[in-house]
Amino acid sequence: MGTRSYIALQIEEDEYLTIFCHYNGYPDDNGAILAEHYDKQEKVESLIQLGDLYFLRSKLEPNPDLPHNHSTPQPNVTIAYNRDEGWSDCEAVHKTLDELNDPGEIGIEFTYIFTFEGRWIYFPTGEAELGFRDVKEDLDNDTVQYDSFFTEHENNMDWPDNGDFALDTLSLIHISEPTRLRCIS
């Protein structure tokens, strides 16, 4: 199962040209690749023109003399559904921030936006209202948010029975072996 992400290019104040990426959507993978290899507007535009991706890598163009698809990928070359798999209807689409923030039926976990200022920002999908984070800054400072921004804000929220919730949740877990967890109800 993949960690799905949106990769978007800001084109208006609340309009983003967006593609889907099926695999490796975590900030330390897709985020790092975007920050390091797609740090110029032209390069981001070329990436977005590929449309939806199977997975993102540092290079855009495969060697045309060699096979390149999800079964036989060329090293470090991005796999695009249309170009490399022959799929249709994979073009970039225009989305608003509200649309990017909705994980929808396909379970988008992270959203990456290349801003007008030429930097990559990200947020766990569904949590845009908690703010955006700078990909490069978080990678450089080892402050990447892998899960959710929720943990930064949960202490400021009024949670009734917060401790009881944790105890109730933990009581459903039975540890049968050191490496296995089994849920019981």
Task: Tell where the protein language model's regions lie, with residue ranges.
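Short, extreme N-terminal segment that most often corresponds to the first beta-strand
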Residues: 1-30
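Intrinsic-disorder/low-complexity signal
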Residues: 20-55
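Low-complexity intrinsically disordered segments
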Residues: 41-172, 176
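Single conserved hydrophobic/aromatic residue that forms the stacking wall/gate
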Residues: 173-185
